């Protein structure tokens, strides 16, 4: 049974390339033909990286967007005063 599991692991990782950006940890890049197989393998073993084209590049803000923050930043009504009025 152990031999079968080891052979299956070797077959699945035959196309994986080790990534050396993270010293001390082993991460594998899996260029399988089917992306679902690679994702399942990576999620199961937690040792694979996603291919570079499928990574997210958008940044999600880590703070809550509330109206109270907007009111505290302005400090008052947004109407022009005498000094800022251009006549």
Swiss-Prot record:
InterPro entries on file: U9-ORF (IPR054417)
Disruption phenotype: Following high LPS dosage to induce severe endotoxemia, knockout mice display significantly sustained sickness responses and reduced survival of 33% in contrast to wild-type mice which show acute clinical signs that peak at 12 hours followed by recovery and survival in 86% of cases. IL6 levels remain elevated at a significantly higher level in knockout mice at 24 hours compared to wild-type mice where levels peak at 4 hours. Minimal intrinsic effects on macrophage function.
Post-translational modification: Glycosylated.
Keywords: Glycoprotein, Immunity, Innate immunity, Secreted, Signal
Induction: Induced in macrophages and dendritic cells by TLR activation in a Myd88- and Mapk14-dependent manner.
Record bears the keyword Secreted: yes
Tissues expressing this chain: Expressed at highest levels in lipopolysaccharide (LPS)-stimulated bone marrow-derived macrophages and thioglycolate-elicited peritoneal macrophages with minimal expression in other tissues at steady state.
Residues in the signal sequence: 1-16
GO BP: innate immune response
Subcellular locations according to the entry: Secreted
GO cellular component, one term: extracellular space
Principal subcellular localization: secreted
Protein's job: Plays a protective role during endotoxic shock.
Descriptive protein name: Endotoxic shock protective protein U9-ORF
UniProt lineage: Eukaryota, Metazoa, Chordata, Craniata, Vertebrata
Gene name tied to this protein: U90926
């Amino acid at each position: 049974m152990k031999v079968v599991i080891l052979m299956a692991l070797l077959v699945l990782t035959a196309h994986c390339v080790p990534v050396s950006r993270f010293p001390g940890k082993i991460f594998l890049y899996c260029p399988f033909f089917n992306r679902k197989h690679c994702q399942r393998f990576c999620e199961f073993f937690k040792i694979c990286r996603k291919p570079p084209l499928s990574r997210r590049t958008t940044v999600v803000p880590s703070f809550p967007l509330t109206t109270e923050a907007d009111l505290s930043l302005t400090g008052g009504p947004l109407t022009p005063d005498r000094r800022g009025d251009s006549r």
